[in-house]
Structure formats: structure tokens, C-alpha cells
């Protein structure tokens, strides 16, 4: 790594090298993000020049140390320099970029710019997140076919990112030159969409066409990596388009502002062509044979998402796929929704020019002898055309302000009109509306007069033009009017005239950036105009759109004292108004200088300690600006809090220390109110910490000598200034600390001493300095590490040798049981290893707590020289750690043939295996290292693959299997087709491991095709269970389709009478089932349990498959079919307690009364299983309850029906009714013969009467409850049945669904059984209450009808 390759002690790293160094420590992206995000946070900071980058860097540097503690290892890696230096550089570039973007956009380009910035933000955000991971993908892909394609994607993406960043921070002139280079980056990126070999499009389409990005199984690591590369490349492709649009838009706008309309047209045209070309590539042309890249990538994503082998919800792949599908769909919609970037038609210049107005020259730009030309541009909503050619020149002679006559545009577009005198810069002079044919060129001249610095001439011309009809409300660049122009020039006579021509509210008219005339006047220092506008009642506190600045902010920033005074005369002025970032006008006044500050300080309402959103006060800014006169002016108020802290708890002194301002630091320290030991939050860093951290030795030395500075103050993690001085290699500061008696054994919270830090640092010379001061070289950290440990484990060879020369203890062990020799081995420090072994050779085979010897650690890291040295010194070549890993296994896994040969020659045990039984040969096979496989096969005197391998006996339980068996199995399982081919041709025996079956099991279609098509293997194999059985069981649809299309028998027995479809059903592979169903499966075939595929689906709880089979009615499936035990699907669903399946079967009409071989219905089984939910559901859906009780109690126990009339005639209902209501156990008797002949019906009106009657006659004997249980059940059933008849008569399905009949029956039975007969009436009535819509008189009629119908 770079950390190890860099010469120790070398300090002059470039910024790029530092960035690379810290990238290894995973810091780089954080700093880049800080640099980007700070722009928004401090966008309106009232400080200019490079100081902006400096303050931003200083403010955000606290992030480097605030995430919990100052990361010692990151800082020691040199990264402490990166936050400050790099953030400043990033910010300077970003501010250059912002300066370019703040230039006014032409109206034609504003919408394009918005679209590009919006879209590129979404794409680039996720692309940056993928960037680092893509490096890992690149390193791990070694496939000969795929690697070149992925490498092309990587090379292009890196070039794109590098060039984009390289031009980003250029100054305007350099930026333009770079973009306009012949055959430069714009041309190269445009060609990225062509099929050229070095383009980006070529590898992307190759990956898609060859299906390299479609995994064949969950273990298809290569395909998943290629998929990642495809997504990364596609997002890069989209980013390239938006980058090009951004640059061509910028160039067009640049030349528009310069007035070079020919160049404007050229880049405007390029802008549209780029969009249309990329649009065609990305979303196609709309024809079926021309799909765009996005559609093809989306198809790949959907294919992967729908792969049945993916346990998507469990491994996070599903979330990633959905995110990318949504992103690409969003981009596609965005691009498709934009037909083109510009109007395709370039307008013809039909202008006929005549001087009809009596306006004589000279006036404004109109001077005799000049020539004037006009050009036009179409504008339609957000689309604009190119600008037309210039009209023929017309000489100016005595008259000005001509009339242009143009035909009305038939498509009703507006027309922008441009004017150019001689070779001067063109100007937009107006806009012609769709129905307007005449245009008088006068409004722009009125606007220009207001800008005339000669106020007398300007006013005279203004009066003339206004009199001749010029429009004072006409708008020009950035939406500015004549009011803005007069405010900027300070022409008070014109402004006075304007105030009499319009209402006061029009004087508040903002331009496109929110600047009103009073903003412009304040920013220009035109106090008289400000005063005039205030008198006319304009809004004094109005704010600009972007930064929310008031006129007072602008005047303060410019230092315009008189303008400030005029503004302050308004009683409505808010002197403490905040801008977007919370800065008040006083903050801005820091830039304006001492005079404007004094004016502010004298105001009663001023808040001298006002804080911005980030907590910065004006005093902070003065110190950051290193402007002591301004700071002194603020201090003169006697009200400034010199210890005020920002959001990171940083004072002005912190910033002075960070920025290295020695004289300002001295001034601050001399203030009696200063607290020099305030610490930042949460890093707890003092000003002294920061001075050392940022290597300002003069400031640090001054603070160390200051009496009111605590030199031993601890930051978060227990880091003192001494620790930082060591980390940063500040020898001068260390000497001073030694002189003033600082304790050199100070420890951090993790017990790092200065010597520990020196041993890890890039300043090894500090080690001897500390040792000379008496530092304890045997001190240990919390993890048990000595300085020598840290030197070796951090790869610091020079530091380790210095310590060894001072006779430190080389046998100390840390918490992992490791000695310094282990660290030297792990980091390839040959010289250190030699030095230790020369002192003590016994450490050669010392094992740590993981049983790793130095040799094993060196092998794991591939440090060849160290390995050979250890072996030459007699190290155990067959050493194994706790997981069984040995040197030979490590190199075979990595594919290092030379080292495998070396270890063979050194008589390593070639049959040594890890704890999983994997030897070097299996590792070579599994990782596709054919060269090692061939070498091993050639070394027959050392390695014989026909030997029995008992290390993997559990994988081959029925017999002893040879290495060859496991090797073939591994080659197939891990989809190493080249090794499979080698084995097959070498062995000439297809029986070993059954490669055809194994390929089907793991879904490796290419291997399957090779064996069938090139080796002529029978698709049904030679075993009872066919390859189709394996493929179906494991859900490999593509393999299933291939086998069937090549004649595989779909009804072949897979064992136990099961076929391929049964296998697919058992694992719930719906797509496989659907395919097999369409290709001749016998659905009537039964397995050994007598179950058809349908019954198997139910018993396996494969709901989707069961529903599919029923819905599709495959081969007239009988939903009531029974297995050998006469059980239906309903029985099976009840056994498995699958209520969802039960509801499905009931929905499709299964017979719930069928009894199995044990005379049980499904309801009986549910009852036996005591599953109340299923019992209640089946009871509710079983229709007439009578069927249930016939089987339980026999026909005799049911109530016999008869006509109601005999009962009605024989009883006085009205007379008996009160007694019925109170009837209970006391008056109950056995059910009489008379009652047994009553027809118990359930009309709504008679429910009450019937229940009273039953109550009076009695159902239950007081003498014997158990003896009457059958009768009670029958009575409850009869009542419930008649109640159900009532519900059925309503012809209201929703009403019937609201009543749970099983619940009603249960409650009625309970009431009867307990003798609470009077409760039956409210039970039934409460069930009816929610659905009854009949009034009492309607119920009486209904009862009468029903009674008559039963008579």
C-alpha cells in the first residue's frame, strides 16, 4: 500500500498523494463532502478572496476531530494535513465554479441549466457512493471475458472524473480555453456514446448482450460484480450527458453575455445535438428494434429481481435493485419528457426597418454615420431557437429609434429582438408578442439613458424618449427596468421623474434575483436615491431571493457610511436583520471597514454579538479576516464578548491559532477577558491544540510560553498538545515542551504515550529524541502494544529498527498474543524480521492466539521475501492456524502458481486441509486457477488425485470418495467451466460426481450446455433422479427450460413417486411449475402417498402454486380429490393449520363434509387440534348447521317441524307474553310432545314470541344436564338454523357476512345449557340490530307474510 511504499519521514507529499494516502484510511470522501457541503453553509459569508476558503476550512476542520475523538492512526498517516489544505483547495475551486454560475444566464438557457443541475445531482450522488466500491469490484474480477469490459468502464469513469475535477476550479479564461480545445474533452465525451472500442457505450452493451450481469445463482459472485459495474457505468454514461449539456449551456451563455451571437448559436446548436444524440442512445427512438440503454439496463434489473433463487428480502439486494430501478425510471421519464433542448427552427430575419418616429440624433447610441443591425430569436415557453443572422446594416442619418415590421409568427411564438451598432456588443432591445407585427426600438434606449453617467444628458434624453412613448416598465437583462438603471447610475433627476409616473408599489419591483431599486442604490452607494425611495415609501427591509440580503447588508458590505445613515433614518429599518446564513449587516460591515463599523456601533439597537447560523459573531469574522483595526474598533464598544463561541464552541482565538495569525494571537492573549483554554466541541481542542495540529510553530510557541494557557489540557480521547506535537513531527515545539518541563509520559485514554505515537508516525527521528529524554519503551497501550509492536504492525521499518537498536523487549505479547515478529511478518518488513531472528530465532514458530505463526501471517499477506526467509531459517512450512489455514492453501486460493511450486519443492504437505476439509487443490478449483490444477495433476509423484479424501467424508457418506470426486463437484458447483472441461477430458468418465446433475442443481446453464452439446450426455442422466429433478427443486428456470427443450422427460420419477413438478412444488418455485405445466406434466399422477401435484402443493403450504393450479384448472383438477387416506386438500390444510389455504379452498367450493379414512371431516380435525380460529371459520362457512349435528346426535334428537298455525291457534300470545319474558329455570320443564311438533321459524316479528314460548316450555331438565345435552344441542341448532333462514331471506350478502353464525350458535347453546333462556332473545336481537333496516310496522307486515307462507 501507499502507506508502506512511501519513504518514511518524507513530508513533501503533494495534495493528490495525501488524498491517495487518506483514501486508504477511508477519509478522502469525507473531506470532499465537507468541501462541497460548506459552500451552502457559508455561501453569503461577508468575506472575500481566499479567506473564504480559509474560514470554511477552519470551521469545518473541527469535523476531522469531532466525530468522537481525534483519530490517532488517521492523523499519523498524514491525513491531518488533508482537512485544512484540501478543503481550502476544494473550496477555492468550488467558489471559482460558483462565480461562473452566478453570471447571468440568458433566458434561453435558464431552464436548461435548472434541468441539468437537478438531474445531475440525483445521478452523481449515487454514483459517488458506488465509486469506492467499484475499485474493489475491479480488483476482484479476473474473468478473461468480463475483466476487459469492466476495465474499460473503469478507465473511462476515472478519466471522466479526473478531467471533470481538473477543469472545475479553473479561472474563467482558463476554463473557456480548456472547453474549446480542438479534439479536447468535450469531443471525447461526446464520442462516449458511439460504438468505438474506447467508448463507454461499447462495454455496456456487450455486458447486456452477453448476459454477463445476470446471476445464475445466489452464489454467482462474478455476475453480481458485473451487474455493479453495469450500473456504475450506466450512471457514468448519464452523467456524461448532463456534463456535456452543462458545459455547452455555459459556453452558449458566456458568448451571449459577451455579445458574440454567432458563437452563441454554435454552442446552442451543439447543446441540442448532444441532447438528441444521447437521448436516442439512452431511451431509444421508440421503435421495437431500437431500445435505449436505460430500457436494456432496466430489463436486466427486473430479470435479476425476479430470479427465484434470490433471498432478496434477507440480503439487501432487493433494496439496491429497487433503488436503481426507481433511479433509472426517473431519469428515463425526465429525458423522454424533454423532446428537445431548443426550438428546431432558426428564424428568418424578415425585419423591415423604417424611421417613423420624429426622434433626431444624436440620442443615446444613435449617432450619425453608425450602422445598425437586428437579429431575432424565437421564444416559446421554456424553449428557444438559435438567433437569426443579422439583418443588412442600416446607416444612421439624423433619425433614431426605428420601427421594425415583421410578419406575425403563425405558431404564435414570441420573438426576441437584438440590436448591434457597428461591431459593438449586441443588446436585447425588446420582445414581440405573437399578434404584434410592428416593433418600435425605443425602450432599450430609455433604459440606457438611465444608465448614463452624465445625469444632465441622461435626463434630457430620458424626457424626450418618455415623451415619444418609451415604456418605463420594459424589462431587460435579469428582469431589470429603468428604475434599477437609474438607481445604479444615481441619476436622481430621472428617478424623481419616475416616482411621479408610477405608483409607489412599482418602486419595489424586484429583478430576477430579487434586487429592488433600493437594493441597487444601496449597493452602488447612491445615498440620494436611497433617501428618495425611502420618502416614496419603498420596502426598506426587502430581501434578495438567493442570499436574503437587505439594502442595509449591501451598503454595510461596501462601507457606504452616508447610504447607511440614510437607511437608518427610516423608522422601519431592522438593523439586526439576518440573511440566508444568519449574518446581520454588522457582520457585513466587517468587510466595509472601521468607519462603517463605528457608524453601526453608535446605534442603540445594534446587537454587537449577533451570531450567524453557524454561531459566528462579527468579532469572529474580524479575527478570521486578520483585520485587527476592525477587531479593535469592535472592542472599543466595550460590549463585545471576546470568548463568544460558534456552533463548534470555537472562539476567535481558536481561529487565530488555526490560521496562524501570530500578531493577532498576541493581541487576543493580552486581553484581560480572554479565556485561552476554551475547547471546541465535541473534540475538546484548545487554541494550542489547533496551532500544533496545523503546524503554526510560531503561534504554538507563543501560546506555550503564555502564562494563561494550560499546556497539559486534554482533548477528547485524552490527547494533549504534547501528543499532537509528536503526531505532527514538530521538533521545535517538542524541545520547548521539554524545556518547560512537560511530562513526556502523558497517556491518552487508550494509554498511548508520545513514544507510541512516534513509533507509528512518519517521523521516526522523534523516537531517539524521546528515548534520550528517558521515555519508557516498554509502556503498553490498553491493547497491550509496546512502541515496537506499533512500529511493526503499522509497517514502520525505520522506527522498529531504531527501537531494536535500543535493546527493547522483542518478546512482549499484546492482547492477541502477538509479538513484534508477527507484525513484521504481516507487513513484509524483511529487515525487521531479520533483525529479530538474528537476536532470537526461537520466535520463528511462535503462535498467536489464533495459532498463526509469522510464516502463516506473511503467507496470508503474500510477502514472498519474508516467507522464503522464514522457511530458509527453518520455519514449519505446514503450520496451521485455528481455522486450518496454511501457507500452501493461501497461495493456491490466490492463484500464485510460482509460490505453489516453491512450496511443493520445499516438500510442503500437499494434502493439508483447513477445518472444512478444503486442500490446496480444491481452493484452486473453486477459484478457477486452472494453471495450478494442471500443475498439480502433472506432479504425480507428489500429488495423486485418485487418493481417498476422508477430510470431506460427511459429503460422501455412503462410500469413500477420492479427491477427484470432490474436485469435479467443486468445479461444477462454483461454475468453473474451463476446469470442468479439463476434468471431463482428462477423466473421460462422466460418472464421477455426476457433473450434469450437479450443474442442474446449482443452475449453471453453460456447463449444462457444454455437457449436453459437446460431450453428448443424455439430458435425463444415468441416475434415477434426473438433472431436471435437481433443476426444478432448486428453482433454476433457465436450466429447466433448456433441459425440457432438449427432450428431458417431465414425468420421470425423481424418487418416492415424485416428478419434477413435485420437486418444484416442495420448494414453492411457481415459475418452474408454470413452465412444466405448459409442457406435458401429468397432473393425475400420484406419488407414494397417493398425492397429486395439487395435493402436494397444499401439503407444502405452497399457496401461490395451489391457487394457480385451481385457477388455471390444469387437466380438470378435482378440488375434492383424495389421497390414500381419503383426505382432501381441506383436510391437509387443516392439518398444517394454514387458514389462508383453507379460505382459498372454501372460496373455490371444496366439499367440507367429506370424511377421511378415519371418518373425520376437516372440521372434526380442526376441533381435535383445538384450533379455534379454523373451527370458527369452518362452522361459519359450513351452511346449514343441521348436517353437523345429524352426524353427532342422530336424526331423532332434532326438532321436528310442523306448521306454525297449530301453535298460534292454541295459545293466547298476548296473555302469555309477560310470563315468557320472565321464564327461567324455576318454571322450566322437560320439552313436551306438543313443543316437539312446533315449526320453529325465524321471521323477524316472531323471534321474540318463539323464544318466549321455548323458554316457557323449557329445554333443560334440572335433574340431569348431561342427559339432555343432545337435546340442548339440537334446540340451539334449530334456533340458529331458523335464524339463518331469516338472514337468507334478506337477499343482502353484506348483511349476512356481518353475522357470525358460529358465534350465535355458541351463545344460544351456552344460554340454554345454563338455564338462562331469557338471554336467547337479546342474543338474536343484538345480532339483527346492526343490519335491520325495517321499521316496526314493516316487521309486522313481514311476520304476517311469513306466517301465512307457513300456514
From Swiss-Prot:
Its main location: secreted. The keyword Oxidoreductase does not apply. One of its GO terms (biological process) is exocytosis. Expressed in venom gland, cephalothorax, and abdomen tissues from both males and females. Residues 226-245 are annotated as: Helix H8 is the probable transmembrane region of the tetrameric pore inserted in the target cell membrane. Belongs to the cationic peptide 01 (latrotoxin) family. 03 (alpha-latrotoxin) subfamily. It comes from the Eukaryota. This is Alpha-latrotoxin-Lh1a. ANK repeats lie at residues 446-477, 478-509, 513-542, 547-577, 581-610, 614-644, 648-678, 683-711, 717-746, 750-779, 783-812, 816-846, 850-879, 883-912, 916-945, 959-991, 992-1019, 1023-1052, 1056-1085, 1089-1119, 1125-1154, 1158-1187. It comes from Latrodectus hasselti. Homotetramer in membranes.
